């Protein structure tokens, strides 16, 4: 599971660096003066619902706001949105009712897909000679059905692959998807 995946993708886009040794959500929680769970809700409200005066005082959101405005301006002028990694072009007509926020969301979803698209072959290559298999991919997590004899090797190597590019991960385990617990 990627830690604060959307937030970290956005940080890459805008050139913002989160402090080392702390999650992105905790960093923002400290700036808001709230607990972690409340901060997550606040952050996503700001990112997908717009900024208020409090958010505009936070350097991360100042950069986000500038980036979103510039992205939208380029989109309106060029008539297309170009994805960051694969340079795919999404034509104006494909984004119905385009707003600053909607165009940004399209870009962010495209970026998460492109980053994962680059990581999946590396994960599959690592697992190719193993009994363990990747059985599910979501936007911010890969589910590996891990053979017990390979657990330590998987935990020792897979996070390195997943964290390439500066995206920290947390590993969970359990007998099924509904009872996963974090591995410390």
What are these regions (language model features)?
Residues 2-100:
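Helical catalytic core of nucleic-acid polymerases
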Residues 47-48, 120-128, 147, 163:
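Hydrophobic alpha-helix feature that most strongly marks membrane-spanning transmembrane helices
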């Amino acid at each position: 599971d990627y830690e604060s995946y959307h937030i970290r993708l956005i940080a890459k886009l805008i050139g913002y660096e989160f402090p080392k040794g702390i999650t992105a959500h905790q960093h923002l929680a400290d700036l808001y003066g709230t607990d972690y769970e409340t901060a997550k809700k606040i952050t996503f409200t700001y990112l997908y619902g717009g900024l208020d005066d409090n958010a505009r005082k936070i350097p991360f959101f100042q950069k986000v706001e500038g980036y979103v405005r510039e992205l939208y301006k380029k989109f309106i002028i060029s008539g297309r949105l170009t994805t960051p990694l694969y340079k795919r072009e999404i034509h104006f007509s494909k984004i119905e009712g385009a707003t600053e926020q909607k165009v940004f969301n399209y870009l962010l979803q495209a970026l998460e897909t492109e980053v994962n698209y680059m990581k999946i072959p590396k994960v599959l290559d690592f697992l190719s000679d193993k009994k363990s298999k990747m059985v599910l991919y979501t936007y911010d997590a890969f589910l590996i059905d891990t053979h017990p004899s390979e657990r330590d090797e998987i935990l020792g190597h897979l996070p390195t692959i997943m964290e390439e590019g500066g995206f920290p991960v947390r590993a969970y385990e359990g007998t099924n998807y509904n009872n996963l617990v974090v591995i410390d």
